C-alpha cells in the first residue's frame, strides 16, 4: 500500500467527472487500499478517487472514532434523500478550511463493495453527510461550490498561500 498525493484547489483535475468502474478486480482493490492508506495518513474521514487523480467512481469512508469501520462505495448511486441538516465541512483537497454546507439528513444509496458485491445502505448523521460530500467529488463538485463567490475566493486564496508556504518548507 502507498500514500497517494491529494490534489488541492485550484487543480482542475478535481473538476473531472469520474467514470464508472467496469470490473472490480485486483487493480481496483489496490486503489481502494491505497485510498484508505492516504485517507488515514491525511487524517480524513472520506476520500473520493478523483481527489487522488484517479477518475473512477470509488469512495472510501471511515467516520468511526477507532478508525476501524471501513466503508467502500464503488459506483455509488443516490436512491433517496430526506430531511435537512448541515455541519461545517472540511476537505482534504481544501486544507485547513471549513464551511457550513446544506445537506440531506438521511440518504439511501446503492453501491458495490470492495469485492464487487452490490448492496444498499441507509445512513444518517455524519455518515450521510460524508457520503454526500464524497459523491459530489465524483461529479467534479466541491463543498465551496455551495458558498458565495466571495467566500469561495477567500478560501482559494488561503489554500494557494498555504500551498506556497508548504512548497518552501
UniProtKB/Swiss-Prot annotation:
Reactions accelerated catalytically: N-terminal N-formyl-L-methionyl-[peptide] + H2O = N-terminal L-methionyl-[peptide] + formate
Pfam families: Pep_deformylase
Residues the entry annotates as binding Fe cation: 91, 133, 137
Enzyme active site: 134
GO term, biological process aspect, one: translation
EC id: 3.5.1.88
Signal peptide positions on this chain: none
Record bears the keyword Transcription: no
Record Gene3D superfamilies: Peptide deformylase
Keyword Iron recorded: yes
Family of this protein: Belongs to the polypeptide deformylase family.
Name the UniProt record assigns to this protein: Peptide deformylase
Gene (name only): def
